[in-house]
Regions:
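Active-site loop segments of alpha/beta catalytic cores
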Residues: 1-26, 51, 55, 85-308
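N-terminal capping/small domains of soluble enzymes
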Residues: 8-11, 15-78
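Short, glycine-/small- and polar/acidic-enriched structural segments
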Residues: 74, 81-84, 88
Length: 308
């Protein structure tokens, strides 16, 4: 099997010659042009011979001119819908085009998008988001919808640049962040607006960040695969696959990737396969591996995956 066939079969629940794998980390290139970002991603992909590439997106969401952080109601009002290529998004789209030209015929790649709620939390000064929820909720909901509209437009353009799907990262679908009822008001409609925009893409992934996550209430999201830190929070990898009916991405503990020995890494991978079986499984970390993870450890993950 080639890489595209292997990943496509895993998503479909078919038989694979071996379990496909990938991992990712933050390159910290948000101040560099898209060409430099693309070069780093391509070099990373080739260094570890990944079965697919999850492209990082460290460029910030474009704020209106003159605003460094959202602080007050007037700032929220200025968050109008954006064009997909506005500001530094254009650099990320340039990176996607370069990546597609370099590897698009040999491997799938997906684009990282942070959910509207996660994005709004990054944009606001400390306390401003909670204040908006309490004092002017309608204004905040309108701003959230504008962010979602902008991200949906960007997601469509990313697919147009060759991405096989998006990796939608949810940063608040956890009980220490919101209740499920709160999430249904403040986040869910805006997550779905983005996913609906790229529903036909073959490789959309839902990443549920954090611990004590809202798992079951997200299972109707239109994605092909789900990713979460199952070494840190329920459900287990097997339970998650059974409850979701979707392909699961896991089996590698990002928190221990830094220091495990080669035998320990191989055991972690083999234990995950023994638990979950070979179908509807992609070997991946539950979140980004630390940027300073030694290359030898990542190579051990690659070797362990290639022996499945």
């Amino acid at each position: 099997m080639n890489k595209i066939e292997r990943v496509t079969q895993a998503l479909a629940g078919g038989e694979v010659d071996r379990i496909p794998f990938s991992f990712w980390y933050h390159f910290g290139l948000q101040h560099m042009p898209g060409r430099k970002h693309a070069e780093a991603e391509i070099d990373f992909y080739r260094a570890y011979d990944l079965d697919f590439l999850k492209v990082m997106n460290d460029y910030p969401y474009p704020l209106p001119r003159g605003i460094r952080a959202i602080e007050n109601p007037e700032d929220w009002k200025r968050l109008e819908p954006l064009e997909a290529s506005d500001f530094c998004w254009g650099e990320q789209l340039t990176a996607l085009s370069i990546i597609n030209k370099a590897i698009g015929e040999e491997a799938l790649f997906i684009e990282t998008i942070f959910s509207p709620w996660t994005t709004s939390r990054k944009l606001a000064r400390s306390g401003a988001l909670a204040e908006a929820r309490e004092k002017y909720p309608e204004l905040l909901l309108e701003a959230m919808d504008n962010i979602a509209t902008s991200l949906a437009s960007y997601a469509r353009e990313a697919i147009g640049r060759g991405a096989a799907g998006i990796f939608l990262s949810l940063g608040a679908a956890a009980y220490d962040q919101m209740s499920e009822d709160e999430y249904a008001i403040w986040a869910r409609p805006f997550d779905l607006k983005i996913l609906e925009a790229v529903r036909d893409a073959p490789f959309n992934v839902l990443h549920i960040h954090g611990e004590r996550i809202h798992f079951d209430t997200l299972l109707d999201y239109p994605v092909s695969a789900i990713n979460w830190s199952h070494f840190r929070t329920p459900p287990s990898l097997k339970e998650g696959r059974e409850r979701s009916g979707k392909t699961v991405m896991g089996g590698i503990d990002e928190a221990t990737a830094y220091y495990l020995s080669a035998p320990e890494i191989r055991k972690q991978v083999s234990d995950s396969i023994d638990e979950c079986g070979r179908r509807n499984l992609i070997l991946a970390p539950g979140c980004s591996v630390p940027t300073d993870t030694p290359a030898r450890n990542l190579l051990e993950v690659k070797l362990a995956a290639e022996q499945t």
